[in-house]
């Protein structure tokens, strides 16, 4: 047995499923998950000594690559001053100043410890600010594991939501309406059914949890207009897209103004950080100056703030996003060319430093239904064959891939060459 196999066997006796987040267990592709010893730049190194070109990037945070010296040094320096104080620090102020400068729609920001905390807190704030209970989310979008978000659509577009996990009470789920991503008609129908009850829409501006599905041109502006028409707030979940699709996020890339924004992943530089913020009048409803409660023992802790501050300063440097786009575009085009040579039907969506690989005969993939029609079994084989070639892709047909500026054009070309060999056998 490999060392990864031995560790996985031991882990399953101690940790549910052997992992601390389900997708890591390789249940979407089968087989034994890699146990990682270290990472540097664009590469992961497993406990058995094999190196992989990494397109998971810790599920998004590693936009600069692994073990970036500026972030590493910032963490070391902060740790020498203490790990956590439970009191305000200067770095929290500097971090808030930087975030609100980089994302102009955020007048104020509150730091938390994860993307899930950010989204659930933003929704609570929207409900408290509007005095309404219902929310709209979209099929195939993921906003963390808060109870109100682990909800699937009922039997029709206007039926009440149903829990999609045991442990979520039906009384919670009934306040969540699930509409179709990229379908404004379904959203309007929900508002017309409940015109005075919907507090907010929460949306991934690029859906990254049904692989990578960008918005149609009219979708995000249409959501903004519907929120304005019916007095609801628009929450854009930029946990995945923030500082990646563009420096000011997908909201800047697609020119839409939210009321609240949720951030995570890159904002922590690899440390556990989330944030939410937006309009000053809305944020003023948050405790301790307003009635909507939110708190966290480790929120804004000095180590995480130091890592995030260093990361964002590097991400804000000229050329970063142009490099991400160039590398991702080359990868997408190369994969399509290699698939076409082998007669493999393939769609590759990409925007900024995100991409998605779909085995499908369709000309495009724009919604959850399109994603579910793709050939998952072929993806599983592709994943394992690419892994054997030393390329680590997301171990699920429903997760986006992530580029970093640490990837070289040689890494990209080697990945395309590996895919060409795999497609020939697929």
UniProtKB/Swiss-Prot annotation:
GO terms for cellular component: cytoplasm. Its EC number is 5.4.3.8. The modification N6-(pyridoxal phosphate)lysine is found at residue 265. CDD domains: OAT_like. Pathway: Porphyrin-containing compound metabolism; protoporphyrin-IX biosynthesis; 5-aminolevulinate from L-glutamyl-tRNA(Glu): step 2/2. It is found in: Cytoplasm. It holds the Pfam family Aminotran_3. It catalyses: (S)-4-amino-5-oxopentanoate = 5-aminolevulinate. Its cofactor is pyridoxal 5'-phosphate. One of its GO terms (biological process) is protoporphyrinogen IX biosynthetic process. GO terms for molecular function: glutamate-1-semialdehyde 2,1-aminomutase activity; pyridoxal phosphate binding; transaminase activity. Keywords: Cytoplasm, Isomerase, Porphyrin biosynthesis, Pyridoxal phosphate. InterPro entries: 4pyrrol_synth_GluAld_NH2Trfase, Aminotrans_3, Aminotrans_3_PPA_site, PyrdxlP-dep_Trfase, PyrdxlP-dep_Trfase_major, PyrdxlP-dep_Trfase_small. HAMAP family: HemL_aminotrans_3 (MF_00375). Homodimer. Belongs to the class-III pyridoxal-phosphate-dependent aminotransferase family. HemL subfamily. This is Glutamate-1-semialdehyde 2,1-aminomutase. The gene is hemL.
